[in-house]
Regions:
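GST-like domain detector, emphasizing the conserved glutathione-binding G-site
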Residues: 1-124
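Amphipathic alpha-helical packing segments from all-alpha helical-bundle domains
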Residues: 125-142
Length: 142
């Protein structure tokens, strides 16, 4: 199994954490998105969207999107599950996972930040991300 990822990508972190929790051996391949390596033809053959992470399975299948990869890992390596089996606990975990992946990640994404000036970045970080994290913390503490 081979994981193409950027060291500082939160989506890549999610997959590396999932692989570590499951104790799965894999080869790590760095993709430096700061210099545009995700746009190289060789990488685009693996992931036509040009995002990290990309997991290449032992069967040669190319998987993208961190949550889809985590789901695939849970289905193919069920010995250690990433999500609780209890429906209520599972839903609470998924609420947090989706809040991070769908609400926080997009406004802290390098592709988005490149187009914003410093003033907007500070506004997003100060108001958007911080308020979402505070709400998540409240949700977790309940």
């Amino acid at each position: 199994m081979k994981l193409y990822s950027f060291f500082n990508s939160s989506a890549s972190y999610r997959v590396r954490i999932a692989l570590a929790l499951k104790g799965i051996d894999y080869q790590s391949v760095g993709v430096n998105i700061r210099i545009g390596q995700q746009n190289a033809l060789e990488y685009r053959r693996l992931n036509p969207v040009g995002l990290v992470p990309t997991l290449i399975t032992d069967d040669g299948e190319s998987l993208g999107q961190s949550l889809a990869i985590a789901d695939w890992l849970d289905r193919h390596y069920p010995q250690t599950l990433l999500l609780p089996q209890d429906d209520s606990a599972r839903m609470r975990v998924l609420e947090i996972v989706y809040a991070i992946a769908c609400d926080i990640h997009p406004i802290n994404n390098m592709r988005v930040l490149r187009y914003l000036g410093d003033e907007l970045i500070i506004l997003l970080a100060g108001n958007g991300i911080l308020s979402l994290l505070i709400e998540l913390q409240r949700n977790i503490q309940q």
